Regions:
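Terminal accessory carbohydrate-recognition/targeting modules of carbohydrate-active enzymes
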Residues: 1-267, 297, 306, 319-320, ...
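Carboxylate/His-rich catalytic cores and anion/metal-binding grooves
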Residues: 244-277, 308-311, 318-328, 516-529
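Glycine-rich, acidic and aromatic/proline-enriched surface loops and short helix-turn segments
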Residues: 277-285, 328-336, 599-606
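Carbohydrate-binding/catalytic loop surfaces
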Residues: 280-301, 339-358, 362, 366, ...
Length: 645
């Protein structure tokens, strides 16, 4: 029984199948993403979506889709599927689907009368290319396949419409054509492994709609250009490979290339292997620089997300070298930042006040996975430089006060992970003494003190420990209230009494200013008011402004983004905190909490975890289809569990 298999009943029910998406990527940031019935429902969907750096830093849809037609005895059966105005779908190729399986690679089986055709897709790892293999499993008469490519050549942030500027010219290449619709774009090569006929019949397919964009309150229709179609005969038992990429291939090698790519894949045959595959999709390499993308399909590399996700996406998979590759790029960006120079790398939001503290936390995980000695040898100077930068009050928005706490101004600009903004103003103006900033600060002080003490720098270690004593005492005085939980932020007389998840870090981190009884009180209230099967709520239902449903147009979603929605990445820190308090006796509870994520592997983005969930039942997945911090933290919990067995 395949772990990721969907039967005819589900596939032909568009209310179900259109809610499930697949994502395949390469190391360069290109991807293929669509629904499991190959009907694009987002402007971000496409068969071949690639970065075009000489235009901008966005991804661009070159090949939106490829419609296949089976031709037998003069009858045509179109396997494509698009949505048009008025909830009209055409040409309804999904009705021929018998099965979809993506345990190894995405494979769709169609049955049209006596014809059984299997379609398998693979996104090439090291170049911008998608390969599609068609195998005729059964047929009782001569069969021809027709392929009609739908071209977009536009940014994922925009739409294309019929226009006179589009270049209709094409050139023949071996077993195919190359074409480019607009200046600045690369040529798109479409080739088959077998001699075929290309029929030039240029046309625009108008009014194709993307219902997910409509749900999100955006424009949702466009026109796609079809230059013509390819036709090729296929015999029973024969396989034909279609290639779309930005460079020409040797057609006779396509079958071999396809097989080699298949052998290079780890099957998604379990919860762990799904997450492992998903983790690798966030790695982005541009020449010698390594990044972690925050999510698909629209996020770039964001500094905070990168440092939070990095341990789970690498160390939890025993991929220490991958951690070091990313940190090599990150260290250069950090040093540029603390030297008040342009960051110079494609890491966004480095200026956010907690980013350096999360970098320290990531390096702390590295020390635990390798050794303190190795961490000190490799990153000791960086850690000391970060600490000096903060202690010398050089950060433009992170101020060390005499009471030992860090203060940041978030009144006019969102500066924490709760970063939603409406009309230029933060929805949640977390400002002043922010609870997780100071939990991170205390943890960093103690960690670096211990690290440098072991390296012989007793003077600095004593300084940092003395600082931590002051910080810890003030932390308890400022944040802990009479109900046993922690204020979310404090700015003078303004105190946020909302029950939010940011206090859980004080229980999860290795070093905490709270004693065990205080930690348990924090854990208990998070368990009681914020825990859901899909993540930790961003706000308690008992607090004012609770809004658990992340739906509607952008402004409505922005107001709900951190007002009760559930976030899986927070579950990682929550479960780590739970194990700190309950140790072996908490194992069964932690394992039960992970079951709902196993269920998630066949929903939303198949084999991955979306950005967030509604905070109330049925806890529907929302936002980006695959989110790095979520995948990372669940992997990190699995790694923590493995150490108990």
């Amino acid at each position: 029984m395949s772990y990721l298999r969907f039967d005819k009943t589900l596939m032909t029910n568009l209310e179900e199948s259109l809610q499930r998406e697949i994502l395949r990527t390469n190391k360069a940031g290109a991807y293929h993403c669509t629904t499991i019935v190959d009907c694009n429902t987002r402007k971000y969907h496409g068969l071949l979506v690639i970065p075009v750096p000489n235009i901008d830093d966005e991804n661009h849809v070159l090949l939106s889709s490829l419609d296949e037609t089976i031709i037998q005895l003069g009858a045509e059966f179109n396997l494509g599927l698009h949505k048009y105005q008025g909830n009209n779908f055409s040409p309804n190729g999904h009705k021929y689907i018998r099965e979809f399986d993506c345990e190894h690679i995405p494979a769709t089986t169609y049955r049209v009368g006596g014809v059984i055709l299997r379609k398998e897709k693979i996104f090439v790892h090291h170049e911008n290319r998608i390969l599609i293999r068609y195998t005729l499993l059964d047929a009782h008469s001569a069969t021809t396949l027709r392929f009609r490519p739908f071209l977009a050549f536009r940014s994922v942030r925009e739409y294309t419409h019929e226009n006179a500027q589009a270049n209709r010219e094409y050139q023949l290449v071996e077993n195919g054509i190359k074409t480019c619709m607009y200046p600045g774009y690369p040529e798109l090569y479409m080739q088959l492994n077998k001699k075929c006929e290309f029929h030039f019949m240029p046309d625009w397919y108008r009014g194709i709609e993307y219902p997910k964009e409509q749900e999100r309150g955006y424009d949702f229709n466009e026109d796609l250009y079809v230059p013509g179609y390819f036709e090729v005969d296929i015999k029973k038992g024969e396989s034909i490979v279609f290639s779309a990429g930005t460079s020409e291939v040797t057609p006779r090698r396509l079958k071999q290339t396809f097989e080699a790519e298949v052998l290079d894949r780890t099957p998604r045959d379990s919860f762990y292997h799904c997450l492992k595959n998903s983790a690798h999709q966030f790695h982005n390499q541009q020449e010698d620089e390594h990044y972690i993308l925050a999510g698909y399909p629209w996020f770039k590399c964001r500094a905070r997300d990168m440092f939070i996700a990095l341990p789970g996406l690498t160390l939890a998979l025993d991929e220490v070298d991958q951690f070091e590759d990313v940190m090599k790029t990150a260290e250069k960006a950090i040093r540029n930042f603390i030297n008040e120079e342009p960051v110079g790398y494609k890491i966004y939001e480095m200026e956010h006040p907690d980013v350096l503290l999360w970098a320290v936390w990531a390096l702390q995980q590295y020390a635990k996975e390798t050794s303190r000695e190795q961490c000190r040898q490799k990153y000791g100077e960086l850690l000391k430089d970060i600490m000096e930068f903060i202690r010398q009050r050089k950060h433009e928005n992170l101020f060390l006060h005499d009471n030992g706490l860090l203060f940041a101004n978030g009144t006019d600009k969102a500066i924490t992970w709760m970063n939603s903004t409406v009309n230029g103003h933060p929805v949640i103006p977390r400002t002043g003494y922010i609870v997780e900033f100071n939990a991170l600060w205390y943890n960093a002080l103690r960690f670096i003190a211990d690290l440098v003490r072991e390296g012989g720098d007793v003077y600095l270690a004593d300084e940092l420990d003395a600082q931590a004593e002051v910080t810890g005492k003030s932390f308890v005085e400022v944040f802990r209230n009479e109900y046993g939980y922690l204020l979310d932020y404090v700015d003078g007389n303004m105190m946020d009494w909302s029950v939010r998840p940011n206090m859980i870090f004080t229980v999860a981190f290795d070093y905490s200013p709270l004693d065990r009884a205080q930690k348990k009180q924090v854990l208990d209230i998070v368990t009681k008011e914020l825990l859901t099967p899909k993540g930790i709520r961003s706000l308690s239902p008992k607090s004012g402004g609770y809004n658990p449903n992340y739906v509607g147009p952008q402004i409505q979603r922005d107001y709900a983004y951190h007002q009760g929605t559930a976030w899986p990445w927070l579950m990682g820190f929550y479960l780590e905190a739970y194990l700190r308090i309950y140790k072996m006796s908490g194992l069964s509870f932690v394992e039960r909490q992970l079951i709902s994520y196993d269920d998630e592997m066949t929903s939303h983005c198949v084999g991955s975890i979306p950005e967030l969930f509604d905070g109330n039942p049925p806890f529907k997945g929302r936002g980006a289809v695959s989110f790095a911090m979520n995948v990372a933290e669940i992997l990190r919990v699995l790694k923590l569990l493995s150490k108990y067995y």
